[in-house]
UniProtKB/Swiss-Prot annotation:
This is Recombination protein 107. The gene is REC107. The keyword Phosphoprotein applies. GO terms for molecular function: identical protein binding. GO terms for biological process: meiotic DNA double-strand break formation; reciprocal meiotic recombination. Keywords: Chromosome, DNA recombination, Meiosis, Nucleus, Phosphoprotein. The lineage of its organism: Eukaryota, Fungi, Dikarya, Ascomycota, Saccharomycotina. GO terms for cellular component: condensed nuclear chromosome; nucleus.
Length: 314
């Protein structure tokens, strides 16, 4: 916002300076401008002013574009930070799931071992019971004991398989979710990398353009300072400007008697009894007014101009 305010101030200053320069040019008479525009000097000055305006406008646009690019880069950096945070969270969650998986798998292994030991113990018990009671229960068939063993083994096996399958499904779901999240984060990082590359290219091009514009503006400014004021050619204002530097010398030297007007001569002839102090005051006032009129007017050498040039310009 500060840079935009500066560019607005620069543009307003340039517009005011151009308006003042245009007013200075329009104060001269129309024949003067039409005649001397034939040489091409005034047109060159206008072209230089237009080029300066364009350079300032381009510089303001470049500053605005650089500000927008900086804002977009800040936003992208924020998005990258958020994505990195989500990625860290997902990785931590994935590690937790792996740890839980390892813990649950360890529990399953212990359960399997316990079940195997229990089955072995039961088999030992059954075998001992069969051996001890073989004589008493010869009439009974061995099919009943086998059925009991098969039922117990199938029941424990179903529990183990169900528990293992459930845990396996949960781990597969968690792995799929983490893979999708990692893929999305990778694609986002790739897009952000591409955007940052394009931003760096744009910033480099903007810097090169800005340096070129600054160099051109400096060259134009040096050229504008070196060239003389075209609007004062053919007038007596240049002599008045030279006389302004010798103001102290003119103040010390008394005005000549040829500068006295006819009204002063008549006043002296009509009133010879006036004091010398009043005469000196009136002479100083007339001299000051004469100098002001001389500085304010613009003399055009009409005698040096040919009538055919005036008719061609009209």
């Amino acid at each position: 916002m500060v840079a935009r305010g500066r560019t607005d101030e620069i543009s307003t200053d340039v517009s005011e300076a151009n308006s003042e320069h245009s007013l200075m040019i329009t104060e001269t008479s129309s024949p003067f401008r039409s005649i001397f525009s034939h040489s091409g000097k005034v047109a060159n000055a206008g072209a230089l002013e237009e080029s300066d305006k364009q350079i300032l406008e381009w510089a303001g646009k470049l500053e605005l574009e650089s500000m927008e690019l900086r804002e977009n880069s800040d936003k992208l950096i924020k998005v990258l930070n958020e994505n990195s945070k989500t990625l860290c969270k997902s990785l931590n969650k994935f590690n937790q799931l792996l740890e839980q998986d390892a813990a649950t798998n360890g529990n399953v292994k212990t359960l399997i071992k316990d079940l195997a030991s229990q089955i072995e113990n039961q088999l030992d018990k059954v075998s001992t019971a069969m051996l001890s009671k073989g004589d008493e229960k010869k009439t009974k068939s061995d099919s009943s004991y086998r059925q009991v063993l098969v039922e117990e083994i199938s029941r424990y096996n179903s529990k183990i398989t169900r528990h293992v399958t459930n845990k396996q499904h949960e781990t597969e779901k968690s792995m799929r979710c983490t893979q999708e999240m990692l893929f999305n984060v990778g694609s986002q990082l790739e897009d952000v990398h591409k955007v940052l590359l394009s931003l760096s290219k744009d910033m480099h091009s903007l810097q090169t353009r800005q340096t070129a514009l600054e160099m051109a503006f400096r060259e134009k400014a040096d050229h504008a300072y070196d060239r003389p004021d075209v609007s004062l050619n053919g007038t007596t204002l240049l002599h008045d400007m030279d006389e302004a530097h010798d103001k102290q010398r003119k103040k010390s030297v008394p005005p000549p008697r040829m500068m006295v007007t006819r009204s002063m001569k008549r006043r002296r002839s009509s009133s010879p009894t006036l004091s010398t102090s009043q005469n000196h005051n009136s002479e100083d006032n007339d001299d000051a007014s004469h100098r002001l009129k001389r500085a304010a007017r613009t003399i055009i050498p009409w005698e040096e101009l040919r009538p055919d040039t005036l008719e061609s310009e009209l």
